[in-house]
Amino acid sequence: TAEPTPTPEPTPLQFTTVDASYFDDALFIGDSRTVGIAEYGSLKNATYFADVGLNVYVAQTKAIAVKNVGTVTLPQLLSQKTFGKVYIMLGINELGNDLDDITAKFSSLIDTVRAAQPDAIIFVEANLHVGPSRSSTDATFNNPRIDKLNEKLAALADGKTIFYIDINELFD
């Protein structure tokens, strides 16, 4: 009898340095944190679908002013422009809700992006931790709960066309 061929270990992807033009075809979807990146960050060539208080429950229906595009819903934006990369950072505003429900809505959002932008790489961004004093005194907005949500969001990544990015270790 033939021995089964062992499945090779996948080669981990390596981070690389890129110049700003890498973000020419990037879309950032997010809440106030993403608004801050759009207004104060250096990636002025990217497209931002971001608004203070944006969450997964309204992200597909809310009309938002997008620079050089106009006021559009996310499905309208996705049908008007082609994106090679889509970064999504949502979840902190929803933290008072059921984590499985948040994850299901996030998954639906990914499905909407994938249907409209089949060739885009999607990056699910971890929710950033809150400060230690907030975490230790708030029953909802605390780092253990944020970590639980982030674990669920990480599970949405397939490592092929959907990737999970967690930069909390850089800030903790």
Question: What are these language model-derived features?
Answer:
Residues 1-24:
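N-terminal, intrinsically disordered, polar/charged segments of Gram-positive cell-envelope systems
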Residues 16-108:
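Conserved SGNH/GDSL esterase-like catalytic core that processes O-acyl groups on lipids
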Residues 78, 113-114, 154-157:
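N-terminal cationic-hydrophobic initiation segments that often serve targeting/anchoring roles
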Residues 89, 125-126:
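Alpha/beta-hydrolase-fold catalytic nucleophile elbow
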Residues 95-99, 131-139, 172:
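Extracytoplasmic/secreted cell-surface and envelope-processing proteins
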Residues 106-111, 150:
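Generic structural signal for well-ordered alpha-helices
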Residues 117-121:
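A short helix->loop->beta-strand "cap" motif at the edges of active sites that frequently abuts
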Residues 131-167:
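Substrate-gating cap/lid alpha-helix
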